[in-house]
Amino acid sequence: MSNDLFAGIGVVPGTFLLPRPDANWTAWACVACDQYTSEPEYWQRVNTLVGHQPSTLRLILPECDLPAPPERIDAIHAAMRDALNVLHPGVTDGFVLLERTTSTGKRLGLVCCVDLEQYRYDGAKTLIRPTEETVASRLPARLAVRNGAPLESSHVMLLLDDPQRTVIEPLYALSLIHI
């Protein structure tokens, strides 16, 4: 798929590894590392729920655990290498349309790659910008996890201003592939 089709909109197609269809997708899924920063008990409950099953919980560093010792970063990298055994190339040069269940009902979403040339976190009025302030003191830990990491896990949610529902809902209506 040509990235020229997406020039100027801030997202591009990508290659996405997905858990095998027989995986426990509930255990695999995990909220972003910057959530529940003052609630370590939340993360303990998730850890208990996941147990020894493959999970993105093992691929992230929850911010409530900062600062992290180097051996924690090493454990995350080892978990990423292990995860490669339960992942398969679900999508190549494309997007992943998903339906997720939240406390307020079902929500649709689109997993995609962000064009980082269109992103700034310093308050600039770029096409893609955060909804909350970036805490610069937490960036070194994020960089430590990414340095030498064999995987990159999606961890941002972009909000789409589409009141007429012209983007995701028509794609969902096509129901191209279900996993």
Question: Residue spans of the language-model regions?
Answer:
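Conserved small/polar residues in nucleotide/adenosyl-binding loops
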Residues: 177-179
